[in-house]
């Protein structure tokens, strides 16, 4: 996190918004927390330019919990997964406890060095699940699938790193820790029409509707994590919003990619150029011996 955000957080650990209590001490049922929660949702809604047709919820836990929740809420018959690497594969395997899952495509044939652009969607499929950015293999969607089933997207590792049309998704979820704050929580943006199709034959705690109905306070919310998200959103806004952040990210990633491309083969990028991630630059050296020295 930026040093100016950390300095602000340091002060709020002893006195949050003039309460005389630190952010880790305030009650999660207090007006000051509710104000901060509402403000955080408003930041997200404004920054993502979301239609009114979306709900925003915050939950304890990270990505692994969301692998479970997406499956147990929306998998009635079968779910399609774009196999672009480890995280989509883990999500599919977890959801398989609740119904049939299958790969709508796969990049396994080339060790996940690219993003496939065709999708085999079978009848009675409830959704297509994708991972926007693949940290291990260094690939990232530039254009998103246009399919006739709800589109669910894990954006944990590139959320709010660039300007995109967030309204093209039926659900987006992200662990906060990658780009936007402290580890231990996730948030989800879910289209109301998809929520209406969610299963109710699962424990109440695992239902997204439970968090919607209780404004993310069905149980003790991850107060500090939400607070760090709030401060990061405030910082992004002050930096000029997503357009400015995207330009910064392009410059930073470009410095490394240019070094790889101009190395005469000493460094070899893993991902296809058109699918390169702006968040995670992956490369190998010319020989295994050089990699050991590196």
Task: Identify the residue ranges that each predicted region occupies.
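N-terminal "arm"/small-domain region of PLP-dependent enzymes with the aminotransferase-like
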Residues: 1-27
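Active-site C-terminal subdomain of aminotransferase-like
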Residues: 2, 176-257, 272
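Conserved N-terminal alpha-helix of the aminotransferase class I/II PLP-enzyme fold
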Residues: 18-66, 86, 93-94
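Active-site phosphate-binding strand-loop segment of PLP-dependent enzymes
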Residues: 95, 107-159
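Conserved active-site segment immediately N-terminal to the catalytic lysine
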Residues: 152, 166-177, 186
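Conserved PLP-binding catalytic core of the aspartate aminotransferase-like
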Residues: 268-294
């Amino acid at each position: 996190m930026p040093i100016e955000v950390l300095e602000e957080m340091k002060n709020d650990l002893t006195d949050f918004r003039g309460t005389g209590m630190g952010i880790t001490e305030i009650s999660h049922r207090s007006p000051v927390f509710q104000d901060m929660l509402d403000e955080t949702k408003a930041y997200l809604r404004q920054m993502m330019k979301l239609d009114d047709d979306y709900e925003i919820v915050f939950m304890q836990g990270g990505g692994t919990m969301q692998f479970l929740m997406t499956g147990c809420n929306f998998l009635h018959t079968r779910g399609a997964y774009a196999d672009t690497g480890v995280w989509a594969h883990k999500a599919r395997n977890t959801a398989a406890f609740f119904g049939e899952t299958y790969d709508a495509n796969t990049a396994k044939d080339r060790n996940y060095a690219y993003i496939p652009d065709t999708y085999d969607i079978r009848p009675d499929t409830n959704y297509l699940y994708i991972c926007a950015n693949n940290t291990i293999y260094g690939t990232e969607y530039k254009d998103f699938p246009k399919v006739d089933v709800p589109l669910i997207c894990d954006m944990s590792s590139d959320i709010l790193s660039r300007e995109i049309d967030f309204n093209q998704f039926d659900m987006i979820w992200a662990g906060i820790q990658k780009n936007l704050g402290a580890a231990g929580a996730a948030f989800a943006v879910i289209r109301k029409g998809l929520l209406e199709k969610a299963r109710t034959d699962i424990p109440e705690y695992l239902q997204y509707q439970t968090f919607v109905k209780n404004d993310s306070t069905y149980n003790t919310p991850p107060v500090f994590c939400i607070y760090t998200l709030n401060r990061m959103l405030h910082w992004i806004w002050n930096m000029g919003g997503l357009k400015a952040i995207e330009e910064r990210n392009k410059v930073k990633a470009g410095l490394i990619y240019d070094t790889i491309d101009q190395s005469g083969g000493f460094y070899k990028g893993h991902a296809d150029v058109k699918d390169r991630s702006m968040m995670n630059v992956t490369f190998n050296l010319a020989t295994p011996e050089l990699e050991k020295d590196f």
